[in-house]
Amino acid sequence: MNSRIMNIARARNGILEWIRVNKPDVDYFIMMDSNSYSCQGDIRPEILGKYLTDKYTKDWDSLSFARIPYYDLWAYSDNAIQLGCWTYPTRLMRYVRSGITAYTYQNVIEKHINNTIFNKKNEDESVAVDSAFCGFAIYKTKVFINHEYLGYLDPSLFDKNKLVQNLRRFPPLQPDGRPVNIQGKLVDCEHRAFHLAAKKYSNARIMVAKDQLFGPFQTT
């Protein structure tokens, strides 16, 4: 098990526990990454304020924000894209005639995001997904406070039909071509379990706003 991911999950769970003990009545809480590649550029408070008005808060329980380029592919799940990109190998052995690598799968995710979040023909200001973070997300406390972050893949949290679609269209293989056993507590992005559990048990609505909260910018 990847100790870095497990440590991050424990740290986020520690924040949740602090909220439970010290601020149980707050309406919202925020998770934010402060590393060099996530929340870059100046924050745009007018965007944050916009989505905290009654007009918008009625439509979401978790809200993250678009970014060009959209960097956080690992936390992203939607429709037939359920598994994290690093469930797939970075390379396959030469004798494996067909299969999907992490980079091929990332291309699939990017294309899907371009066709949904960045689709100019879609006039909606936010898009429903199964999991998304991209460095900054707001959560309704009453919906999320009793869920937890995991640093491993838990198949029981997925929508079964969507997971089956993922496995059929994009079957994960080991480098030697053998199937990946997704029941084996594989390392996974900690946000996915948090979001999927909230969707499954609390009917959470996970949304991505098309507006950029940081920037805007085209390159990073």
For the regions a language model picked out, list residue spans one by one.
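Active-site-proximal specificity loops/subdomain of glycosyltransferases
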Residues: 1-27, 31-32
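Alpha-helical elements of Rossmann-like donor-binding domains used by nucleotide-donor carbohydrate transfer enzymes
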Residues: 10, 14, 46-50, 193
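Short, high-confidence coil segments that cap the C-terminus of an alpha-helix
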Residues: 24-26, 57-61, 203-204
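A structural signal for short, well-ordered beta-strand segments and their strand-loop junctions
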Residues: 30-31, 62-65, 206-209
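Conserved catalytic core of nucleotide-sugar-dependent glycosyltransferases
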Residues: 36-163, 171-173
